[in-house]
Amino acid sequence: MAIRKGSSYAVAALLALASVAAVAGEVFFQEKFEDGWESRWVKSEWKKDENMAGEWNHTSGKWNGDAEDKGIQTSEDYRFYAISAEYPEFSNKDKTLVLQFSVKHEQKLDCGGGYVKLLGGDVDQKTLGGDTSYSIISRPDISRYSTKKVHTILTKDGKNHLIKKDVPCQTDQLTHVYTFIIRPDATYSILIDNEEKHTGSIYEHWDILPPKKIKDPEAKKPEDWDDKEYIPDPEDKKPEGYDDIPKEIPDPDAKKPEDWDDEEDGEWTAPTIPNPEYKGPWKQKKIKNPNYQGKWKAPMIDNPDFKDDPYIYAFDSLKYIGIELWQVKSGTLFDNIIITDDPALAKTFAEETWGKHKEAEKAAFDEAEKKKEEEDAAKGGDDEDDDLEDEEDDEKADEDKADSDAEDGKDSDDEKHDEL
């Protein structure tokens, strides 16, 4: 049947458009670091007096999918970095909150990361640093071989609460998109490159509130509770004469030397060897305990100190975004930041930025690696002796550093990293 055109059709179309507009997400902040970005961001003077403040470069990096798609990149080794931007203050109460950004570690990062922070209240952007109070932190965290995870912290009542779940992060030298979503039902999700890597409950995965249930402190294990899983086998008896078996016996193959003189050398005795019959102290075999009741556990009761917070997910004041980090090796590049209440909108933003260029960036990286390998191969034998000397020097330096670290009790790089 044909659809009749007219006023009813027009009204339906308008209602459909109105419905789409009603569910469209709100963007609180968006940054692609295009021309004019410096007017929106404030570089902190944190650590400047100590000559430890690093400079940011506006660049697309050594390899990229689009030379015109630039971000901000750390440029100096062993430096602190801090920069922030302000946006209209809002609260995520009764709404979803999405924080998303892209990051690329061109330097093949082995220790570091980068705190991307949401802050509220009054912040002096010129002094923003490691001690500045914040509401939310999300970052990929890499610490040598031990830590390679997405580091997420929520601050409530002045206390910083680290997520209790380990979510692996990307560790290569390409751009990756990290998304942190908090919902009004107190659930959250962590996405990497638009793929959900972890989801769960804020109640369960952060120790923001006391536990709802606790072990009953008054409960006692019953005296007749049998928690021995195995018991000695009453049927197993020690063989007669077992304790008389010697641990060692004279070597039956040993012969008295022909030139042995009993008067001068003393009475000859054969050397001993382990006795193959000796089995060590006798131990009674164990069997399953037929009366085993399991490990006793105190029953759980309601925690009298627990007080629910229906707005555990919410932050009353979100007004700034900051990037703050310490870098042993510089080269980390941040780009394409968005703060919104619509996960679908954030996903589209990622696809239109990172997604559009990821294949070209991978090709550029592969080409750069191939060129580097060819250049290294071209040097050939001329550098082999030098390389060997360098390796020996590096090994000696590592040994010296290990000795120094053993004395200090802590690696100096880790001290810098831990300072953050």
From Swiss-Prot:
InterPro entries: Calret/calnex, Calret/calnex_CS, Calreticulin, Calreticulin/calnexin_P_dom_sf, ConA-like_dom_sf. Residues 382-402 have a biased composition (Acidic residues). Residues 1-25 form the signal peptide. A motif (Prevents secretion from ER) lies at residues 417-420. Residues 213-285, 355-420 are annotated as: Disordered. Its main location: endoplasmic reticulum. Glycans are attached at N57. One of its GO terms (molecular function) is calcium ion binding. GO terms for cellular component: endoplasmic reticulum lumen; endoplasmic reticulum membrane. Residues 197-262 are annotated as: 4 X approximate repeats. One of its GO terms (biological process) is ERAD pathway. Keywords: Calcium, Chaperone, Endoplasmic reticulum, Glycoprotein, Lectin, Metal-binding, Repeat, Signal, Zinc. It comes from the Eukaryota. An alpha-D-glucoside binds at Y115, K117, Y134, D141, E324. It is found in: Endoplasmic reticulum lumen. Can be divided into a N-terminal globular domain, a proline-rich P-domain forming an elongated arm-like structure and a C-terminal acidic domain. The P-domain binds one molecule of calcium with high affinity, whereas the acidic C-domain binds multiple calcium ions with low affinity. The interaction with glycans occurs through a binding site in the globular lectin domain. Belongs to the calreticulin family. This is Calreticulin. It comes from Zea mays.
